[in-house]
Amino acid sequence: MRCKMKFIVFEGLDGSGKSSLMAALERELQNRAINFLRTREPGGTPLGDEIRNMILRKEGPAPTPRTELLLYEASRSQHVDQVIRPALAAGTWVLCDRFAASSVAFQSGGRAISEADVVMLNTFATGGLKADITVLLDLSVEESRRRRQGRGAVTGETEDRIESEADTFHENVRQSFLKQSREDAAAWIVLDARETPEVLFKQLLQSLTERKVL
């Protein structure tokens, strides 16, 4: 049923255009009078935002890979319980910037933690909740870095601890996203993030229509 609430997640390297594409989909949902909630991970709740700052800040001691994973999962558990599940139960669509696939990509792909362990913790933190559709904006590491640097030159913002990781880390993250998309192709939409925002939205809308989401 096309009007049923949907949980749509946007994934990709930093600078891939997730925010712009989410904003375009928001406008489409508004035009169709579909109630929606936009949120993000890590964060999405007051406690989650505190955890986000702990993970991403450069100041102070960095968490070990396992600690980092557990912090992400703690934020996710709070987010699912307090925000995502209540919204879905109320019939509201949820658009989320990153979710469980990011933990597989960053903590397993990037940090080399066992994928089985990450998946197990994802399942525990979410209570088994999965995205209906995951939209992957695929972008090369080089282009991701170029866009991040360009953004920083305009805003004056510096890169966070994760963004500052080496290119090899980000390439492993990218390849993990692509691997996940191949293994669950029916639930993933992969877009070439080099395209213009207009083309990307047109492709997304077409894919959502073909899958009877919209």
Curated annotation (Swiss-Prot):
Source species of the chain: Bdellovibrio bacteriovorus (strain ATCC 15356 / DSM 50701 / NCIMB 9529 / HD100)
Single GO BP term: dUDP biosynthetic process
HAMAP family given in the database record: Thymidylate_kinase (MF_00165)
High-level lineage: Bacteria, Pseudomonadati, Bdellovibrionota, Bdellovibrionia, Bdellovibrionales
Sequence positions that bind ATP: 12-19
Signal peptide: none
Family of the protein in this entry: Belongs to the thymidylate kinase family.
Keyword presence, Transferase: yes
Single annotated GO MF: ATP binding
Tagged with keyword Ion transport: no
Name this polypeptide is given: Thymidylate kinase
Documented EC number(s): 2.7.4.9
Substrates-to-products reaction catalysed: dTMP + ATP = dTDP + ADP
CDD domains membership: TMPK
UniProt keywords, alphabetically: ATP-binding, Kinase, Nucleotide biosynthesis, Nucleotide-binding, Transferase
UniProt-listed Pfam families: Thymidylate_kin
Function according to Swiss-Prot or TrEMBL: Phosphorylation of dTMP to form dTDP in both de novo and salvage pathways of dTTP synthesis.
Cellular component terms (Gene Ontology): cytosol
